[in-house]
């Protein structure tokens, strides 16, 4: 198998490079064909990778970057004021063919702005969209947009649907069911943009558009791809993650009660642990920026080692599936 090379913005995120380096090393150990390039302050990164096996160290490169983009920094500042940031250098490695994907836990707005500047969008795409896998009763659905585009036109939503369908196919869904997230399933429901997008999708060639889906239908697994603007999508994503965390905490509190509750908890806990693990946000961490001429994965800034590993694994899958090239080929057929 040919090598996969991923550039990691090692300085991004809420907790600095320690978790990022630990996740990188774990992914190297699990995937012999993987090569990683850590971008950041060399002295700091060299200390963190010291002591690794010779085999892992041979597949781990460090590239210097003298600047770091803050999590609360304006994207315009990142574009103009920090040409040697770890985020930008990692993206330039992808642009120059020295890496096949970039993973960052840094500032979302800055990452999107720099990705569009450095990598450019695919022909026919006005705006990239953030997409991630959401657990459902039937498995997973791809939800987009997750916050990159707060205000969207009907044409934007149409393009998101096309990109989401291709991404779902790359992840193994034969004929993805595509739906628009709405406040009802009837044709009369929704705002003007959603209604116009529905009209465009109903006439799309080669797209399995099934109509509107409500929030509860999303979790029942009624669609494989669910499309919405970034304002709605980000609220839905954060609410889902908060709900999953709250349910896990409430269950643990419940089973720490009296003797009977503890006995019931002892019997049920293995199954509940499996459920918690399946719904844990860390397991589904890693949102893809679809529509770029290169692979970019955004991790939660607060992600721990497991979550960062999930983001790197998503990048690996998209490399193996040649996702940007597949998108480019399908967009010519599906875009008006």
From Swiss-Prot:
Pfam families: FA_synthesis. It is found in: Cytoplasm. It is an enzyme of class 2 (transferase). It catalyses: a fatty acyl-[ACP] + phosphate = an acyl phosphate + holo-[ACP]. Pathway: Lipid metabolism; phospholipid metabolism. GO terms for cellular component: cytoplasm. Its EC number is 2.3.1.274. GO terms for molecular function: phosphate:acyl-[acyl carrier protein] acyltransferase activity. Keywords: Cytoplasm, Lipid biosynthesis, Lipid metabolism, Phospholipid biosynthesis, Phospholipid metabolism, Transferase. It comes from the Bacteria. The keyword Oxidoreductase does not apply. The keyword Cell wall biogenesis/degradation does not apply. InterPro entries: FA_synthesis, Phospholipid_synth_PlsX-like. Signal peptide: none annotated. GO terms for biological process: fatty acid biosynthetic process; phospholipid biosynthetic process. Catalyzes the reversible formation of acyl-phosphate (acyl-PO(4)) from acyl-[acyl-carrier-protein] (acyl-ACP). This enzyme utilizes acyl-ACP as fatty acyl donor, but not acyl-CoA. Homodimer. Probably interacts with PlsY. PANTHER family: FATTY ACID/PHOSPHOLIPID SYNTHESIS PROTEIN PLSX, PHOSPHATE ACYLTRANSFERASE. Belongs to the PlsX family. This is Phosphate acyltransferase. It comes from Pseudomonas entomophila (strain L48).
């Amino acid at each position: 198998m040919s090598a996969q090379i991923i550039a990691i913005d090692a300085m991004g995120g809420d907790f600095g490079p320690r978790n990022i380096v630990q996740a990188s090393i774990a992914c190297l150990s699990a995937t012999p064909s993987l090569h990683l390039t850590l971008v950041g302050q060399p002295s700091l990164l060299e200390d963190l990778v010291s002591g690794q096996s010779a085999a892992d160290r041979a597949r781990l490169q460090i590239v210097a970057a003298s600047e770091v983009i803050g999590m609360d920094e304006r994207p315009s500042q990142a574009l103009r004021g920090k040409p040697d940031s770890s985020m930008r250098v990692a993206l330039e490695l992808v642009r120059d063919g020295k890496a096949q994907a970039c993973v960052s836990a840094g500032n979302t707005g800055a990452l999107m702005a720099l990705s569009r500047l450095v990598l450019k969008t695919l022909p026919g795409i006005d705006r990239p969209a953030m997409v991630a896998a959401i657990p459902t009763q039937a498995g997973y659905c791809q939800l987009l947009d997750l916050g990159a585009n707060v205000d969207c036109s009907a044409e934007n939503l149409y393009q998101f649907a096309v990109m989401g369908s291709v991404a779902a196919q790359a992840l193994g869904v034969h004929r993805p069911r595509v739906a628009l997230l709405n406040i009802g399933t009837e044709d009369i429901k929704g705002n003007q943009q959603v209604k116009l997008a529905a009209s465009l999708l109903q006439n799309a060639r080669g797209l399995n558009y099934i109509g509107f889906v409500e929030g509860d239908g999303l979790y029942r697994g009624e669609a494989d791809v669910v499309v919405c603007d970034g304002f709605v999508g980000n609220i839905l994503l954060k609410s889902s993650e908060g709900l999953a965390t709250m349910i896990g905490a409430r269950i643990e509190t419940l089973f720490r009660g009296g003797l009977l509750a503890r006995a019931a908890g002892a019997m049920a806990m293995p199954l509940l642990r499996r459920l918690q693990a399946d719904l844990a946000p860390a397991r589904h961490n890693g949102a893809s920026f679809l529509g770029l001429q290169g692979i970019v994965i955004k991790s939660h800034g607060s992600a721990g080692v497991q979550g960062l590993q999930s983001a790197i694994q998503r990048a690996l899958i998209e490399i193996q599936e040649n996702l940007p090239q597949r998108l480019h080929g399908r967009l010519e057929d599906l875009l008006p």
